[in-house]
Amino acid sequence: MPTREELVLERIRDTPEGFVRAYGDVSPGAPRFAGTVLSANHDPDLPWWRIVRADGSLAKGARQRALLDAEGVPFRSDRVDMRIARLP
């Protein structure tokens, strides 16, 4: 049985290019745990930039924005347009 951390990492890896998930989507009921997992992970292939705050705002700023822009993620001002880009 996978650990809680492994489940979070699996959900992050399963987030396809051009879409995002909120911290609470990858760690239901414990969004801060997702942040802890991300900050402790050093896998260069983990698409960390696809995880955003529930309101679409970015935790990592300019670098995260550039990576999401390159994938065609839609924005409304400085936030991801969660109505379009958030996975159900």
PLM regions and their residue ranges:
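Nucleic acid-binding interface residues in structured DNA/RNA-binding domains
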Residues: 1-88
